[in-house]
């Protein structure tokens, strides 16, 4: 129902689940219990370790159904798919050139 009764005592951020609050608290404590066995880099969340480990293995489990290009992160696939649908919702206020991703616009804007 939108209730968020679990409140972080450090920053006041509210959560609807106690486990999410516990995970959030690691930001304040600096706790990083998940360690990469390859390089020793540490992470707050297991999911972040799993994604990081792909840099060592080269695994790219997310494949574009349009062109077959593969990505290590789902978010990178989603960004890539904009190339195929042609959507360009970010426009440069200086010259009007349009881009599919905010990051591309930011990079372009530096030339002005």
From Swiss-Prot:
InterPro entries, sorted: Znf_C2H2_sf, Znf_C2H2_type
SUPFAM superfamilies (UniProt xref): beta-beta-alpha zinc fingers (SSF57667)
Name the keywords, alphabetized: DNA-binding, Metal-binding, Nucleus, Repeat, Transcription, Transcription regulation, Zinc, Zinc-finger
Broad class of where this protein is predominantly found: nucleus
The superkingdom of the source organism is Eukaryota
Q: Name one Pfam family in it.
A: zf-C2H2
Gene3D superfamilies reported in the protein's UniProt record = Classic Zinc Finger
A single Gene Ontology CC annotation of this entry is: nucleus
Q: Where are the zinc fingers (C2H2-type)?
A: 6-28, 34-56, 62-84, 90-112
Give the location in the cell.
Nucleus
Q: Name one GO molecular function term.
A: zinc ion binding
Q: What does this protein do?
A: May be involved in transcriptional regulation.
Family statement drawn from the similarity comment of this UniProt entry = Belongs to the krueppel C2H2-type zinc-finger protein family.
The name this protein carries in UniProt is Gastrula zinc finger protein XlCGF9.1
Give the organism the record lists: Xenopus laevis (African clawed frog)
Q: What is the lineage of its organism?
A: Eukaryota, Metazoa, Chordata, Craniata, Vertebrata
């Amino acid at each position: 129902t939108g209730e968020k009764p679990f409140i972080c005592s450090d920053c006041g951020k509210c959560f609807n689940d106690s486990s999410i609050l516990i995970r959030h608290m690691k930001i304040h404590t600096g706790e990083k219990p998940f360690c990469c066995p390859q390089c020793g880099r540490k992470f707050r969340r297991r999911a972040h370790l799993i994604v990081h480990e792909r840099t060592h293995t080269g695994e790219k489990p997310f494949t574009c159904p349009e062109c077959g290009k593969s990505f290590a992160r789902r978010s990178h696939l989603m960004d890539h798919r904009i190339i195929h649908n042609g959507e360009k919702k970010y426009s440069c206020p200086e010259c009007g050139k349009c881009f599919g991703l905010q990051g591309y616009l930011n990079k372009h804007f530096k030339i002005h």
